[in-house]
Each structure stands twice: as structure tokens, then as C-alpha cells.
Amino acid sequence: MISFVIFNIFYENNKFFFGKIWTCLPINDTLKCDNATYSIILVILDNMTQKSFNQLAVKFCGFTCADDLHTATALGVDAVGLVFYPPSPRFVDVDTAKMLSLTVPAFTTIVALVVNMEQDELTNLTKQVSLDIIQFHGDETPARCQKLASAVNKRWIKAIRVKHNDTAASILNQINEFKSWGASGVILDTFSDSAYGGTGHLFDWNKIPNHSPLPIYLAGGLTPDNVGDILSNQSLMAKIKGVDVSGGIEKEKGVKCGRRMWAFMNNINNVHR
């Protein structure tokens, strides 16, 4: 494992000042070569200057180990997601989630992805794990989402799984209903009969409403290879607030790939230059 120190550089009154911001950042096995190491440092430093101009929020979801979380937060993601749905290969139990949440730096949002969770289980979860937002990703109704989120005093977002017969109008109707019950945003993901998410498949982005009363976060099939093309589409960019990716940055289910996380963020930053 390679460890190093990264310094933030400030310029004030004709002088440079160096402030240490990360110490002994681990680089996992996928980032052993010097070029990759230098690249990840450059991207982190580049994010310091690009972040204020890049208004597109980025969430990496489905973390199961601290090393992957360290890499993601160093790359400048806005939010990280932990999955509390046992059938998922990205599932983490309460003890693991508690440990992971303590490694996330300030100002990075921690999102709890739950699927049809009971209130007592959610209450226990939020008492033990430091979480910022609840992401309801199952069959929860707007009323159910509001009740559960209020019980634990958390903001919430809802995943809308887009079906083949959905239209922009039908999706907008769902968004309006979730807004009326207090949602902070919606994630548009691809519908599947066999899973509640993480399928790696795209849906028809032409179905995304033009004018949503809630922020829309795009998910479903995003990868480092296609995110640049997606974000170069100005009509699409006008509709979405951010992107949410899980499988597209993995080397196997539940295990993130440092190179793919780096490539995803690098391609986003290239679009916004």
C-alpha cells in the first residue's frame, strides 16, 4: 500500500501558503503504478479549483470498505451511499456502516439506501450510524416515506424506477406527489422486475421531465465511458441536478475500482472546463 501526503496551496498577499489536507491517503491495489498515483493527485488538486464551477452533484453508492471510501472522498464526490438492503451484494450491516460513516470527512453527505424498511429498524439504524439523508429505493408510498423520515428526523429522497411505459408526464406526476409529502429530491433509475436497483441498465433519458419541482439525480447504467457524453448533452444537463453511480465504478459487485472512480470524476471535470 502506498501512502502519501497531499497539500492544499493557498495564494494570498503575494505569498504561497501550504495547508495539509490529507495525510497518508491509501492507494489500493488498482492504483499502484506511478502514473495512476500522479493522476489521482492531479485530479484531487484540480477538483480544488474546479469544484466551485462544477454545479453537478456526484454521488458514489454502495461502499463496503474504508479504502474505497477514502479514494472517493479524496476525488471530491459530494455524497456517498451505504446500502442497507440484505439481498444486495453491496449490503453493509450496522456495525460496518458505523465504522464506514466515521471515516467520511465533513461536508460529504452520507446517504442511507433502504428498501421497504420497517420503522423500528430505521430508528435503530439512525441511532447507531451517522447518516444525513434517507434514500427510499423500494415500493414506499410518498406518505410512507414522509412518516419514516419524520420518525428519525432526516431529510429524504425517493428513487423512481422508470418503466418502459412511463412518460415525462407520468414521471412528473410522481415527482409532484413526492414533493407534496416533503421529499428533498428524486433519483431516476431503471426499472427491473428482478431488482430494486443497481442493474447497470440505462433508461430513455428523453422521458426526464423538462421542469421538475424537485432536483433530479440521474442513475442507471452510468459509467466512466458514457458520463462525458451524457453531460455534454445540454438539454439533459438542464434537467438534472446530479448523477448517482454504483456498478459503473466497480471491479466486481460490492468492490469499487479506484481507476474507474478516478476516470468518472475526471470525465466530469473535463466536461465542465
Residue map of PLM features:
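Short, positively charged and aromatic/hydrophobic N-terminal segments
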Residues: 20, 26, 30, 34-44
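Conserved N-terminal beta1-alpha1 strand-loop-helix module at the mouth
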Residues: 44-213, 217-218, 222-273
